[in-house]
Amino acid sequence: MSTIYMSQLPATLPLMEGDQDQGLYPAFHRAKDPPILFPFMIDSAVEHQGQIYGDQGLRRQQVLGESNQQFNDHMMMGGSDVFLTPSPFRPTIQSIGSDMIQRSSYDPYDIESNNKQHANGSTSKWMSTPPMKMRIIRKGAATDPEGGAVRKPRRRAQAHQDESQQQLQQALGVVRVCSDCNTTKTPLWRSGPCGPKSLCNACGIRQRKARRAMAAAANGGAAVAPAKSVAAAPVNNKPAAKKEKRAADVDRSLPFKKRCKMVDHVAAAVAATKPTAAGEVVAAAPKDQDHVIVVGGENAAATSMPAQNPISKAAATAAAAAASPAFFHGLPRDEITDAAMLLMTLSCGLVHS
């Protein structure tokens, strides 16, 4: 058995002479048949030697021999024109060869060969660099090269500016020195008595505080005394105002019901009065009142004695009048009686009118 492709055979075959049998070559005379992608098997002349005879057998052997030789030549040369009529649907040897992926000869575990190749400098494009490994590095806290903490952006920029100025001054041969402490390093130069930027930061702050204290001491002698007198005046006036308020609010401190409550003054006077050595009767003040009333025995001369809080003269007079026996008998005994008396008075007025 020998393998051949239909496309390897010539498109036209020589015409057979005489009355040769054309049925032996049916595939060679079908021009409209589609090309066959896969080879088919043709029996060799050795197997059909008993059936083939004469010139027909010789010609058939010659055609098969030429086709096999042509196919072998193309396969040995590896040409791209194996198929005489290329088609986009049939692969070619060249396209298959270009699509093949060639494996790299680099072995990452073969350390000795890799070292030799790097030493010799003979590296191909397939093994130019070993595969890189991804590394995740955690960014630590940024620290100052000197060991301190990170400065703020503004301070960092200012320090950088000061360092650049110092480097420039050192390059020019000029070194700035504080006129007070003779230091050459400071975060900020301040103005002083010797001129601008003649003091370091600490000396400038110290001298500024001293100047302010001296100015306050010079200008504050005359201004401090009036300020003290003005400040002391309200302190003396405020307690007086508070006392006046308390004295005026003595009568208004109680609720309205307690201030207008009607009390049986006769029973209260009998229970509360007690004779004294001088023959006077002392009427005890109710709980709601802030004074004690002393009434004489015969002439009923009423006087007022302050108990705890001082009261005005009008309040004392009203209290003395209320403490008299006639006033006690004239008042009703309770609210119901008072209401009945008011109702009778109104009805009596309506009848007489």
Swiss-Prot record:
Protein function: Transcriptional regulator that specifically binds 5'-GATA-3' or 5'-GAT-3' motifs within gene promoters. Influences the expression of nuclear encoded chloroplast-targeted genes. Regulates chloroplast development and promotes chlorophyll accumulation. Modulates plant architecture (e.g. height, length and width of leaf blades, and flowering tillers production) and represses tillering, probably by modulating number of cells. Promotes senescence. Involved in grain filling, panicle development and starch production.
Zn-finger (GATA-type) residues: 178-203
Major localization listed first in the record, in broad terms: nucleus
Stretches for region Disordered: 142-166
Cited PROSITE patterns: GATA_ZN_FINGER_1, GATA_ZN_FINGER_2
GO process terms (BP): chloroplast organization; plant organ development; regulation of DNA-templated transcription; regulation of flower development; response to absence of light; response to cytokinin; response to gibberellin; response to light stimulus
Effect of gene knockout: Reduced chlorophyll, reduced height and increased tillering.
Name of the protein: Protein CYTOKININ-RESPONSIVE GATA TRANSCRIPTION FACTOR 1
Top-rank taxon, per record: Eukaryota
Expression induction: Induced by light, nitrogen, and cytokinin (benzyladenine) treatments, but repressed by darkness and gibberellin (GA).
Protein location: Nucleus
Cysteine pairings via disulfide bonds: none
Organism name: Oryza sativa subsp. japonica (Rice)
GO-annotated molecular function: sequence-specific DNA binding; zinc ion binding
Similarity field: Belongs to the type IV zinc-finger family. Class B subfamily.
Motif window: Nuclear localization signal 2: 244-251
